[in-house]
């Protein structure tokens, strides 16, 4: 069932979801087969269908889970500490005191384990308050994978349960990397995630650089126990579809994934399992940017949440709500503290650029005026 505006934007003091964000809910770009995200999703799914399920036990695929989840699903069930920075309203979209827009597809992990699923992928849109630039967007798409093992499997291999699960995990994901990138050099880097131990990130050498492909690890036993399988072991991984698609298809700006411009959409027509690796984005006319600076004094008692108590995520959210996808980048270009008055000044440069037409100073000035008014009213700053 489709979510309505009242399901996501509520008259609740904790709600920080804008109409701009709500309008992305239910778009489901990963469902579009002739779209870079849909193409990549299909390629990954094909790998797990044909390369992994060799013992007759296929992976289940879930790609239509509602993005509003309980706070416990998003954090507690994944063993994320109560004081973790990601719980801040500076980083997470809260619907009310009980629910959020999911920050990761891992929010459905325990739910699927409790339902008896032991091999599955979850795909969907996820939401995070973040900075604005060519590689960051408040809505993106993730894929979560889980595989559970019975004791008989590691006993037959004569291995310790953790070592067995880790070996199976790395073999599976190295195969996925080869499926996507070809015969590339790979390396494993130790990492930390609250819900896996040991944890690692897989990197591939592609296009002359090391690229982080995914994060993964052996699932923490507490999660399996809560899921009803204390005697079993499991691995889990997660990856961002946009991050990989930008590299594989040479897409330079993350906003392009949301474009309805036919010059973008027609480039992916006819994509299939035999030709998708040859597809590359062909740039069309890049219209000039319009730059606007905004300088302001921060209030002395500012509390913007998060570990750094930075205004940036809140400011970016507000600017995006006003300017939508015309906003290309928001960048802090100057910061100083005046010792005489004890105040700190920030100056941000906002880059506006349309993918489809030239912008006029008049229309951007109107957006900028609205933004300035809202910044004063909502963030309590003093414009300079």
Where are these regions (language model features)?
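Short histidine-centered catalytic/ligand-binding loop motif
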Residues: 28-33, 144-166, 292-308, 360
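Conserved short secondary-structure elements within globular domains
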Residues: 118-128, 181-186, 327-335
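A carboxyl-terminal module marker
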Residues: 194-384
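Short amphipathic alpha-helical segments
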Residues: 32-40, 44, 161-172, 306-315, ...
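Short secondary-structure junctions
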Residues: 48-59, 177-185, 319-330, 376-381
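Class II aminoacyl-tRNA synthetase-like tRNA-binding/catalytic domains
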Residues: 1-142, 148, 210-224, 231-232, ...
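Beta-rich nucleic-acid/ligand-interaction surfaces
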Residues: 58-87, 182-207, 332-341
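A conserved active-site cap/scaffold subdomain adjacent to cofactor or substrate pockets
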Residues: 136-174, 178, 228-263
């Amino acid at each position: 069932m489709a979510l309505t505006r009242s399901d996501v934007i509520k008259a609740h003091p904790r709600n920080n979801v804008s109409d701009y964000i709500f309008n992305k809910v239910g778009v489901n770009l990963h469902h579009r087969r002739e779209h870079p995200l849909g193409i990549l999703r299909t390629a990954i799914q094909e790998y797990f269908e044909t390369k992994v399920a060799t013992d007759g036990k296929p992976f289940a695929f879930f790609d239509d889970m509602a993005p509003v989840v309980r706070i416990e699903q998003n954090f507690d069930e994944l063993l994320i500490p109560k004081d973790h920075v990601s719980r801040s309203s500076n980083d997470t979209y809260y619907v009310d005191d009980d629910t959020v827009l999911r920050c990761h597809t891992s929010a459905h992990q325990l739910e699927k384990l409790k339902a008896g699923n032991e091999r599955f992928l979850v795909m969907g849109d996820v939401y995070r308050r973040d900075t604005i630039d060519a590689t960051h967007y408040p809505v993106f798409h993730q894929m979560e994978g889980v595989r559970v093992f019975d004791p008989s499997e590691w006993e037959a291999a004569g291995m310790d349960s953790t070592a067995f699960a880790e070996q199976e995990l790395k073999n599976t994901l190295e195969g996925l990397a080869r499926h996507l990138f070809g015969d590339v050099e790979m390396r494993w880097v130790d990492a930390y995630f609250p819900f896996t131990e040991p944890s690692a990130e897989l990197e591939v050498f592609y296009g002359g650089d090391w690229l982080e492909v995914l994060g993964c690890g052996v699932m923490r036993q507490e999660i399996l126990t809560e899921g009803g399988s204390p005697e079993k072991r499991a691995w889990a991984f997660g990856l961002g579809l946009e991050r990989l698609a930008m590299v594989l298809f040479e897409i330079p700006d993350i906003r392009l994934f949301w474009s309805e411009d036919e010059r973008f959409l027609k480039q992916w027509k006819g994509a299939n399992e035999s030709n998708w690796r040859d597809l590359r984005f062909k740039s069309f006319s890049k219209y000039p940017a319009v730059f606007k600076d905004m300088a302001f004094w921060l209030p002395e008692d500012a509390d913007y949440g998060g570990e750094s108590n930075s205004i940036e995520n809140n400011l970016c959210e507000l600017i995006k709500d006003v300017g939508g996808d015309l906003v290309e980048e928001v960048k802090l270009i100057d910061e100083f503290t005046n010792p005489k008055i004890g105040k700190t000044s920030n100056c941000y440069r906002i880059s506006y650029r349309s993918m489809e037409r030239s912008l006029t100073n008049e229309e951007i000035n109107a957006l900028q005026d609205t933004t300035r008014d809202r910044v004063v009213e909502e963030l309590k700053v003093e414009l300079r």
